[in-house]
Amino acid sequence: MAKIALILGSVRSPRVGNDVTGWVHDVLKSRPSDDLQIEPLVIADFNLPVYDEPVMPAMVPAMKQFTKEHSKRWSAAIASYQGYIFVIPEYNGGIAGGTKNAVDYLYNEWPGKPVAIISYGTQGGNRANAQLSESLELVMKMKVAPTKVLLPFAAGTDVFSAINDGVLGEESQKAWAEAGKKEDILKALDEVKELLKQPKE
């Protein structure tokens, strides 16, 4: 059985990412029975500082080793999965620093594995989605699912509750369902499944 990490990219507190990732997880649970095991993975739980290792990630493990416990834990966690689904916010028109820092902590744990990207924000996080897609595909040599899911918050009180209170509003959830976002998420997962069948390059 292949294990897929459902990675929550935000490290802020409060963060609406908890609710968004929960909503996405519920959608994924609605899929027909398959041989995938999907597990939530929260970047904030690893307490990663700005990269503080004395070695380049690309040198690990062939030539060097990580020296910090947080790096070792993060590396071991990511290495244990065969694929990933990122759920990421967009801050100030781009990828969140905590997300990028966590990705850049590692190198050899990523290449050849499939990944889907789901983003959220006032406009759905399209810029952050595109930036992470490019980084993972071109630099980390990952297989990025073609379907990029954008989850924009409903206008009005939902935006304020998301930003200020870390709460996902009912109107946003309703709008996502009506816009076919659940189907998009399941389509992205199907693409990850197909990419899993391809040999690593």
Curated annotation (Swiss-Prot):
Pathway field of the UniProt record reads: Secondary metabolite biosynthesis; terpenoid biosynthesis
What is the top EC class of this enzyme, as a single word?
oxidoreductase
Query: Which organism does this record belong to?
Result: Nectria sp
Q: What does this protein do?
A: NAD(P)H-dependent FMN reductase; part of the gene cluster that mediates the biosynthesis of the meroterpenoids nectripenoids A and B, as well as cochliquninone D and isocochliquninone E. The pathway probably begins with the HR-PKS ntnH that catalyzes two chain-extension steps to form a reduced triketide, which then primes the SAT domain in the NR-PKS ntnG to initiate three more cycles of extension to give a linear hexaketide corresponding to the polyketide part of nectripenoids.
Task: Give the superkingdom in one word.
Answer: Eukaryota
Report a single Gene Ontology molecular function: FMN binding
The gene behind this protein is ntnL
Keywords from the named record: Flavoprotein, FMN, NAD, NADP, Oxidoreductase
Pfam families per UniProt: FMN_red (PF03358)
What name does this protein carry?
NAD(P)H-dependent FMN reductase ntnL
Which EC number(s) does the record attach to this protein? Answer: 1.5.1.39
Keyword Disulfide bond attributed: no
Annotated catalysed reactions: FMNH2 + NADP(+) = FMN + NADPH + 2 H(+); FMNH2 + NAD(+) = FMN + NADH + 2 H(+)
Gene Ontology cellular-component annotations: cytosol
